Amino acid sequence: MLSGYDNVDVAKIDGNHPHDSILQFFAIAKANINQYDNIFIDNLTHYQKLWLLKKGESTKSGMPEIKDYALLDNHLLKVVETFNALDANVIFTAWETTRHITHDDGQQYTQFIPDIRDKIVNHIMGIVHVVARLVTKADGTRGFMLEGDQSIYAKNHIDQRNGCLQRELLEVNHDEGSKK
């Protein structure tokens, strides 16, 4: 989607070697970080599936083993932490899923969240500064919800915006001269 724009470099994860590929991408990003204001990882949902598929290739059943899920959880947390340490805006995308929540009083609702493994989705959402939900209005305008409610998990720890147009997401902290 961004390929072909000025000042945009696109690297693709090697589906046959997703683990090594993300590590190589990090090494390149770190070595060249002074050339980038923003780094996008698109997307964590697909990456975790590729990672588990690769693990499954080495089993008799062709399916990942139980231990692989714990390894993936640790790996994803490290990926997010490691990329977040770079001196750039790091944006992780994920597909969306829902989870059903029942309160002690019996009230039930459905919450939209990033499609990341249940065991770590809360942790990952907790260690990033912004969790946003992309929405499209009837007129085609796309924007991000930056403040959540019980049905949408969203947060914005960078500024006071509750939402923004898609093109405005990274228009933050220009007055302070900071990338982040």
Model-derived segments and spans:
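Conserved P-loop
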Residues: 1-41, 45-50
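Short, well-ordered coil/turn elements that cap or connect secondary structure elements
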Residues: 5-7, 85, 125-126
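Hydrophobic/aromatic beta-strand patches that form the interior of the parallel beta-sheet core
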Residues: 11, 91, 129-132
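Conserved, well-folded catalytic cores of nucleic-acid-processing
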Residues: 28, 47-50, 82, 127, ...
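P-loop NTPase motor core
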Residues: 38-123
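Conserved GTP-binding G-domain of TRAFAC-class P-loop NTPases and closely related GTPase folds
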Residues: 98-180
